[in-house]
Regions:
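SAM-dependent methyltransferase catalytic region
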Residues: 1-164
Length: 164
């Protein structure tokens, strides 16, 4: 349930951490082996939560990312779409709509970026590290859900910036 059915997004890093912690504590009350589960090789396998803090793409250079990821067939248009989509992620949060052109690349992009990280190319690996959080949050935002529980914003008008 934790890994396949529950997803969470927040614009506040601490709120996302607390949500993940609360989910793990609630689950550990029902399953004492939650934190000691191992794979076939005996390695600890804690649950992988899908609770993310939305990250902005401010400061990322499309040119630099495209240059380092081009040898791995990561398209410049895909990088541009990711960077532009999440430029104001902390402001708009889950209101962000993932463009259809980007949705078509989201299925293979994590595997490609994992291969980039294993390639040994230091600059390409750093570019993949910069792009991976954006890909993960785009995947969650592109999904369709049967039920959504949302928290209304608490911001008063005097704190709203010009984008809102």
């Amino acid at each position: 349930i934790l890994e396949k059915n529950l997803y969470g997004l927040d614009i506040d890093d601490r709120a996302a951490q607390m949500a993940g912690f609360a989910m793990l504590m609630k689950a550990s009350a029902d399953d004492r082996r939650l934190f000691t589960a191992t794979d076939d090789a005996g390695n600890l396998q804690p649950p992988k939560l899908n609770v993310l803090s939305l990250q902005e793409s401010k400061g990322l250079s499309v040119d630099e990312l495209a240059t380092h990821l081009a040898p791995f067939k990561v398209q410049r248009t895909t990088i541009t779409a990711l960077v532009e989509t999440f430029e104001h992620a902390k402001t708009f949060g889950s209101l962000i709509q993932i463009p259809y052109a980007l949705k078509t690349h989201l299925a293979v992009l994590p595997q490609v970026l994992a291969l980039v990280k294993q390639s040994g190319d230091m600059y390409a690996s750093a570019a993949a590290d910069d792009l991976l959080p954006l890909v993960q949050q785009a995947q969650v935002l592109a999904m369709q859900f049967d039920a959504v529980v949302a928290n209304p914003p608490y911001m008063s008008e005097k704190f709203m910036n010009c984008l809102v």
